[in-house]
C-alpha cells in the first residue's frame, strides 16, 4: 500500500480541521478514527462560539477552515452576546443540531480527497529517530511523512460516574490505550487532565412551561455570512438550582471522586462541576442553568451548568429538584473524564514536536478545552504537517495576529497547568483582532499558504477598499460644523443616520457599514493598539537562534537565564512575555544578539 | 522594553548647576518637543540648529523656564534617532517640571543606560563601548534590584499591592461580565471603584513628590520686605556669611542662592530682593523676579520684621508658604500665631523653623515612603489610564484598566493576564 503524506489521528474538531487544511495543499491525507460515523461529533454542549471562542471561529473561517460552515449549516438558534458592550467583545454563539453538525462536517470533509480509515492507532512508527508513520492495533502500518495526533480525551481516557470508573475516551467509546506510551517513548511529558460533562435529559419528560424561554434572534447571525435554513428555529431555556439541590450535594460530597480524592487529574477552573459551585460559592442560594435542545427534533436536552461526577442515583434526585424537571428522566448521566495530555511547551509554534520532526499535535492532547480551540490548532497543525510533507518550512501565526496566535503563544510559550480555554481578556490587542475583521487580517495569509483561492482575497480587498473610500469621504464631509468622522465619533450618532442624510454614491453592505462605524468611533483606541502592535513586532524582529546558550550571555541575571533556557523563546518578544525576565535582561540579550550578528 | 519609543532623561548631574540639560530621543521626539515648546517649531529646525524660547506645560499654558532647544536629526545624533535637547536653568525644580511635561506628552523616562544602548543599536558605537554598557547594566541592574527590593519593603509595598489588588479585582469583574455575559454576574459599580483607586494613586503620588524632594533636593525662597532680615536668616540657617547683609533696605537687588542641607534634604535657598512698592526700575525688576522665584519654589518663607508695623502681604503661593517673624529678640510691634518667631542674632526659633521646613517638604510621615522614578512613572501612567477609563464603554474600560494594571505590575512583577483569569474564577461563579 502506498504511503500518505499526512496521517491524522482522530476525527474530532481538531482532526477534522487538520485533515481539511492538509488536503487543501493537495497532499495525500488519511484520517484514522475508531468510529468514522462519529467524525465531527460534539461530546459536550451543542453550541459553537461565545466570548473568545467566536473570534477563534471567525479566524478559522478566514483561514479556510470548515467549523464555521458546519455550524452555520446546522444552526437552530443564534445570539450575539455583548452587543452593547463594544466591538472588541461582541460574540456570536450558535446552538446547533448535534447530529446535523456531524453530518455537515462529514459532508464538507468529503469535498476534498481525504481517506477516512477505521482503526485504533496503537503507536507511532519510529525507526532510527525518524517518524515513518503509524501502526494500528490490528497490525496495519500506515506509512506517512507527517502525523497529526488529535486524540482528544481518548489518550488513556478514564470516565468516572461517582466513585466508579472505567477506561473510555467518551461515554460508550473505548479509549486510545497505547498511543500515550508512544508519545512518552518519543520523550514527551504527559500529564493527567480532567474535564466533565452534565447530564442529558429526555425532552418529553421536561415541563418546559415552567422554564424561562430565551428566543432565538431574528434575523439569525452566522459565522460565514450565510445563516442555515433552521438558524432561528428553536428557543433555549433557563432554570435554577434550589435549596434542595444544594442540600443533596452537600450531604453527598463524599461520593464524588474528586472530593474523595480518587481523581488526580487537574480540572479546568472555568468548567466547574455543580459540586464545586455549591462548595466554593456557599453563600449563593441558587445557580443559573441553561437548558439547550440537542437538535431540531429535540429528543434530549443538555443541562448546561450542571456537570457533575456524583453517582447516577443521586443525579436523578438532583435533577428532579430543579423547577421544570420534577418528573425528568435522565437519558445519559453526567460524568468526569481523565486523560493524558502532553506538555505544549515541547512543541514549536507550528505545533510540531520539538523532539520528533514530522510529529504534530492539536486539541485536547495539547492541553486545551473546547471545540473552537481544538479546531484552531487542528488547522495550524494540519497546514504545517502538509508543508512538512512537501518540504516547506513551518508557518506561524504570531501573537499580534489574533486569537489563534495568542492561543498558540500561550500554550507553547508558557504552557498550561489546566485545560486552557480562550478568553477575550487573554488577548492584548482585542480591539484590533475582532471577529468582524478576521477576513481582513487573515485572508492574505490563507491565500499565500494555499488554504483559500486567490479570488477570495480579491473580494476581501475590494470590501476594505470600499470601507477606506467611505472613511475618506466622511473625513471630507462637513456635518454640523465638524467632519463626518468627528460627527460619527459622538456616542449618540450612527453611520446609518449619516448615510441617510449624506448617502454614498454606492450604498455599503451591512458588514462594510459596520466596519466604517467601528473604525470611526474607536479611531483613537485602535490607533493606540496599533502602536502596541508595532512595539510587539519590533521585539519580534529580534530573533533568538535555536540552541542559544543563555547562561553564557553577559549581563543576564541567573534567574532570567534559567527561565530562558527552559522556555527557549524564539524572539525578544517571546522572551519579554516570560515571567521573571526583566527589561535589563532583555537589554543584555539584545546587545548580545546584535554582537553575534 | 521598546526599541524606538520616545525616552527622556536629565543629562546633567544631580544638584544645582548653571544650566541643566534634558534630552528627548526616539520616534515622535520632535512632535513631543513641539507640544511643550513656545518658540520656533522644532519640527522645522534642521539638524544641529537651535532656537530660543520657553518650555511650557501644554495643559495649562504655564511657562516653565526660558530655554535653548537643540535639534539633532536621525541618524546624526548621539542615539542615531531624532533627538531634542532642552537647555534650561539648572534648578532641579525646573528640570523636574520639564521631565514631567515630556512624560505627560508621551515620552518615557529612560532606563539606565538606555540612551547609550540605543546609540549602540543604531550603530553609533563600537564593541568596546558596548562592553562598557553591558558592564553598566550588570552593575546597575544589581543596584536597581537592591533598590527595588528596599523600596518594596514594608508600608509602601503593602499599599501598592493593595492598590493593584483592587484594580485586578475590578478588572476580573469586568472580564467576568464580558466573558460570561449570561451567567448572572452582579453588575459593576465601576465608577465608584475606579474613583477610590484613583484617590489612592493620588495619595501615593503626593507622597512621591515628598520623597523625590528628599532624593533630589528642593528649592526654598525667602521673600519679604526690604530689610526684613531675609539675608540674616539665610546666613543663620547656613551658619556662615553668605548673603551681603547691610542695614540699607534693598541691598539684595537680585537674588542669591546657597546650597543647604536640612535633615538630609538638599535644599537650594534663594534669598530674593525685598518686596515693596518701589519706583526704582532696577529694584522693581528685582521685586518681580522675587515673586517669580516664589512661584517656582517648592517652599516659600515669607519673612516679616516683627519689630516694625506689619506690611500688606504680597501675592504668594500661600499653600506652600511658611510665615516667619524675624528679630524676635527686639520688642514686638505685633503678634500673630501664624508667624513663627525667630531671631537670627540669638538663634531663637531656628530649630523650630528647620523642623517646620522639613515637615512642609516631607510631610508628617517624614518622607519614609521613598518612591523611585520607576514607581512614580508607573503610578502616573496608571493614573492616566484610570482617569480615561471612567468615561469608556465596558470593553474599552477593560483595556484601559488592563494598561493601568500592567503599569503597576512593573513594580510587583505580577502577570496581569494570568491574575485576571485566576480572579475571574476565584471571585465569580461562572463557567458551565
From Swiss-Prot, chain A:
The keyword tRNA processing applies. This is tRNA uridine 5-carboxymethylaminomethyl modification enzyme MnmG. It comes from the Bacteria. It is found in: Cytoplasm. HAMAP family: MnmG_GidA. GO terms for cellular component: cytosol. Homodimer. Heterotetramer of two MnmE and two MnmG subunits. Pfam families: GIDA, GIDA_C_1st, SAM_GIDA_C. NAD(+) binds at residues 267-281. The gene is mnmG. Its cofactor is FAD. Belongs to the MnmG family. GO terms for molecular function: flavin adenine dinucleotide binding. One of its GO terms (biological process) is tRNA methylation. Keywords: Cytoplasm, FAD, Flavoprotein, NAD, tRNA processing. Gene3D superfamilies: FAD/NAD(P)-binding domain (3.50.50.60), GidA associated domain, C-terminal subdomain (1.10.150.570), tRNA uridine 5-carboxymethylaminomethyl modification enzyme MnmG/GidA (1.10.10.1800). FAD binds at residues 10-15. NAD-binding protein involved in the addition of a carboxymethylaminomethyl (cmnm) group at the wobble position (U34) of certain tRNAs, forming tRNA-cmnm(5)s(2)U34. InterPro entries: FAD/NAD-bd_sf, GIDA_C_N, MnmG, MnmG-rel, MnmG-rel_CS, MnmG_C, MnmG_C_subdom, MnmG_C_subdom_sf. It comes from Thermus thermophilus (strain ATCC 27634 / DSM 579 / HB8).
UniProtKB/Swiss-Prot annotation, chain B:
InterPro entries: G_TrmE (IPR031168), GTP-bd (IPR006073), GTP-bd_TrmE_N (IPR018948), GTPase_MnmE (IPR004520), MnmE_dom2 (IPR027368), MnmE_helical (IPR025867), P-loop_NTPase (IPR027417), Small_GTP-bd (IPR005225). Gene3D superfamilies: P-loop containing nucleotide triphosphate hydrolases, Probable tRNA modification gtpase trme, domain 1, tRNA modification GTPase MnmE domain 2. It is an enzyme of class 3 (hydrolase). Residues 217-362 form the TrmE-type G domain. K(+) binds at residues 227, 246, 248, 251. GO terms for molecular function: GTP binding; GTPase activity; metal ion binding. Exhibits a very high intrinsic GTPase hydrolysis rate. Involved in the addition of a carboxymethylaminomethyl (cmnm) group at the wobble position (U34) of certain tRNAs, forming tRNA-cmnm(5)s(2)U34. This is tRNA modification GTPase MnmE. It comes from Thermus thermophilus (strain ATCC 27634 / DSM 579 / HB8). The gene is mnmE.
Amino acid at each position: 500500500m502506498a504511503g500518505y503524506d499526512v496521517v491524522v489521528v482522530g476525527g474530532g474538531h481538531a482532526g477534522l480541521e487538520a485533515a481539511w487544511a492538509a488536503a487543501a495543499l493537495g497532499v495525500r491525507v488519511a484520517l484514522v478514527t475508531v468510529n468514522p460515523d462519529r467524525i465531527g461529533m460534539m461530546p459536550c454542549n451543542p453550541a459553537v462560539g461565545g466570548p473568545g471562542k467566536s473570534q477563534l471561529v471567525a479566524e478559522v473561517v478566514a483561514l479556510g477552515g470548515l467549523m464555521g460552515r458546519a455550524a452555520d449549516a446546522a444552526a437552530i438558534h443564534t445570539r450575539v452576546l455583548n452587543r452593547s458592550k463594544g466591538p472588541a467583545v461582541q460574540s456570536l454563539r450558535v446552538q446547533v443540531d448535534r447530529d446535523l453538525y456531524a453530518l455537515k462536517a462529514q459532508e464538507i470533509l468529503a469535498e476534498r480527497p481525504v481517506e477516512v480509515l477505521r482503526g485504533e492507532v496503537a503507536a507511532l512508527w519510529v525507526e532510527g529517530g525518524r517518524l515513518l508513520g503509524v501502526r494500528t492495533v490490528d497490525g496495519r502500518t500506515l506509512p506517512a511523512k507527517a502525523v497529526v495526533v488529535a486524540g482528544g480525551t481518548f489518550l488513556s481516557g478514564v470516565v468516572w460516574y461517582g466513585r466508579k470508573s472505567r477506561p473510555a475516551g467518551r461515554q460508550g467509546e473505548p479509549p486510545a490505550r497505547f498511543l500515550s506510551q508512544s508519545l512518552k517513548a518519543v520523550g514527551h511529558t504527559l500529564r493527567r487532565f480532567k474535564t466533565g460533562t452534565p447530564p442529558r435529559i429526555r425532552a418529553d419528560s421536561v415541563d418546559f412551561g415552567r422554564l424561562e424561554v430565551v428566543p432565538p434572534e431574528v434575523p439569525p447571525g452566522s459565522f460565514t455570512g450565510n445563516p442555515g435554513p433552521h438558524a432561528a428555529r428553536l428557543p433555549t431555556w433557563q432554570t435554577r438550582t434550589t435549596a434542595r439541590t444544594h442540600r443533596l450535594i452537600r450531604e453527598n460530597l463524599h461520593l464524588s471522586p474528586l472530593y474523595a480524592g480518587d481523581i488526580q487529574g487537574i480540572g479546568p477552573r472555568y468548567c466547574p462541576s455543580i459540586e464545586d459551585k455549591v462548595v466554593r460559592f456557599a453563600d449563593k442560594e441558587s445557580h443559573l442553568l441553561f437548558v439547550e435542545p440537542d437538535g431540531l427534533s429535540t429528543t434530549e436536552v443538555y443541562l448546561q451548568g450542571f456537570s457533575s461526577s456524583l453517582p447516577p442515583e443521586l443525579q436523578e434526585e438532583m435533577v428532579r429538584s430543579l423547577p421544570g424537571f420534577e418528573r425528568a428522566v435522565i437519558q445519559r448521566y453526567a460524568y468526569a473524564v481523565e486523560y493524558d495530555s502532553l506538555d505544549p511547551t515541547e512543541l514549536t509554534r507550528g505545533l510540531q514536536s520539538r523532539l520528533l520532526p514530522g510529529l504534530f499535535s492539536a486539541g485536547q492532547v495539547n492541553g486545551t478545552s473546547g471545540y473552537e480551540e481544538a479546531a484552531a490548532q487542528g488547522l495550524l497543525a494540519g497546514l504545517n504537517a502538509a508543508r512538512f510533507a512537501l518540504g516547506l518550512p513551518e508557518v506561524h501565526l504570531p501573537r499580534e495576529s489574533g486569537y489563534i496566535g495568542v492561543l498558540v503563544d500561550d500554550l507553547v510559550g508558557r504552557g498550561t497547568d489546566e485545560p486552557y480555554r480562550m478568553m477575550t481578556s487573554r488577548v492584548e490587542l482585542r480591539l484590533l483582532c475582532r471577529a468582524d475583521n478576521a477576513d481582513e487580517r487573515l485572508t492574505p495569509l490563507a491565500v499565500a499558504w494555499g488554504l483559500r483561492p486567490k479570488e477570495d482575497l480579491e473580494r476581501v480587498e475590494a470590501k476594505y477598499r470600499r470601507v477606506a473610500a467611505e472613511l475618506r469621504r466622511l473625513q471630507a464631509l462637513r456635518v454640523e460644523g465638524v467632519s463626518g468622522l468627528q460627527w460619527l465619533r459622538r456616542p449618540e450618532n450612527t453611520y446609518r443616520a449619516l448615510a441617510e442624510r449624506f448617502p454614498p454614491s454606492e450604498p455599503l453592505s451591512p458588514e462594510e457599514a459596520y466596519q466604517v462605524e467601528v473604525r470611526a468611533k474607536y479611531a483613537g483606541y485602535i490607533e493606540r493598539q496599533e502602536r502596541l502592535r508595532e512595539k510587539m513586532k519590533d521585539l519580534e524582529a529580534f530573533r533568538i537562534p535555536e540552541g542559544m546558550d543563555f547562561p553564557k550571555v553577559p549581563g543576564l541575571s541567573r534567574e532570567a537565564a534559567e527561565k530562558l533556557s527552559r522556555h527557549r523563546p524564539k524572539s525578544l518578544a517571546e522572551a519579554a512575555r516570560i515571567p521573571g525576565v526583566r527589561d535589563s535582561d532583555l537589554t543584555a540579550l539584545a546587545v548580545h544578539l546584535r554582537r553575534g550578528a | 522594553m521598546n526599541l524606538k519609543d520616545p525616552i527622556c532623561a536629565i543629562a546633567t548631574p544631580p544638584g544645582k548647576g548653571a544650566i541643566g540639560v534634558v534630552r528627548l530621543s526616539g520616534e515622535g521626539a520632535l512632535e513631543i518637543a513641539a507640544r511643550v515648546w513656545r518658540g520656533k517649531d522644532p519640527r522645522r529646525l534642521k539638524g544641529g540648529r537651535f532656537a530660543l524660547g520657553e518650555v511650557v506645560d501644554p495643559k495649562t499654558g504655564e511657562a516653565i523656564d526660558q530655554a535653548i532647544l537643540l535639534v539633532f536629526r536621525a541618524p546624526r545624533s548621539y542615539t542615531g534617532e531624532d533627538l531634542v535637547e532642552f537647555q534650561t536653568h539648572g534648578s532641579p525644580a525646573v528640570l523636574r517640571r520639564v521631565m514631567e511635561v515630556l512624560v505627560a506628552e508621551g515620552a518615557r523616562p529612560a532606563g539606565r543606560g538606555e540612551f547609550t544602548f540605543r546609540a549602540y543599536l543604531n550603530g553609533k558605537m563600537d564593541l568596546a563601548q558596548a562592553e562598557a554598557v553591558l558592564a553598566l547594566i550588570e552593575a546597575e541592574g544589581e543596584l536597581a534590584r537592591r533598590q527595588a527590593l528596599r523600596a518594596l519593603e514594608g508600608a509602601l509595598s503593602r499599599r501598592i499591592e493593595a492598590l493593584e489588588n483592587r484594580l485586578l479585582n475590578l478588572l476580573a469583574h469586568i472580564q467576568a461580565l464580558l466573558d460570561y455575559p449570561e451567567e448572572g454576574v452582579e453588575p459593576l459599580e465601576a465608577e465608584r471603584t475606579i474613583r477610590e483607586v484613583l484617590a489612592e494613586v493620588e495619595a501615593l503620588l503626593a507622597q512621591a513628590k515628598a520623597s523625590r524632594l528628599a532624593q533630589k533636593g528642593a528649592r526654598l525662597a525667602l521673600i519679604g520686605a526690604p530689610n526684613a532680615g531675609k539675608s540674616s536668616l539665610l546666613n543663620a540657617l547656613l551658619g556662615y556669611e553668605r548673603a551681603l547683609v547691610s542695614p540699607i533696605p534693598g541691598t539684595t537687588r537680585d537674588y542669591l542662592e546657597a546650597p543647604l542641607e536640612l535633615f538630609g534634604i538638599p535644599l537650594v535657598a534663594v534669598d530674593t530682593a525685598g518686596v515693596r512698592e518701589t519706583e526704582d526700575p532696577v529694584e522693581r525688576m528685582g521685586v518681580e523676579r522675587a515673586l517669580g522665584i516664589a512661584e517656582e519654589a517648592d517652599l516659600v518663607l515669607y519673612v516679616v520684621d516683627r519689630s516694625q508695623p506689619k506690611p500688606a502681604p504680597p501675592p504668594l503661593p500661600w499653600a506652600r508658604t511658611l510665615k516667619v517673624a524675624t528679630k524676635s529678640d527686639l520688642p514686638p510691634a505685633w503678634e500673630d500665631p501664624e508667624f513663627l518667631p525667630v531671631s537670627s542674632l540669638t538663634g531663637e526659633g531656628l530649630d523650630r523653623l528647620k523642623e517646620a521646613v522639613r515637615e512642609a517638604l516631607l510631610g508628617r510621615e517624614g518622607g519614609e515612603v521613598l518612591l523611585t522614578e520607576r514607581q512614580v512613572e508607573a503610578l502616573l501612567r496608571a493614573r492616566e489610564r484610570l482617569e480615561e477609563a471612567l468615561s469608556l464603554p465596558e470593553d474599552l474600560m477593560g483595556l484601559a484598566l488592563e494598561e493601568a494594571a500592567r503599569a503597576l505590575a512593573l513594580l510587583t512583577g505580577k502577570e496581569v493576564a494570568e491574575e485576571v483569569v485566576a480572579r475571574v474564577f476565584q471571585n465569580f461563579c461562572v463557567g458551565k
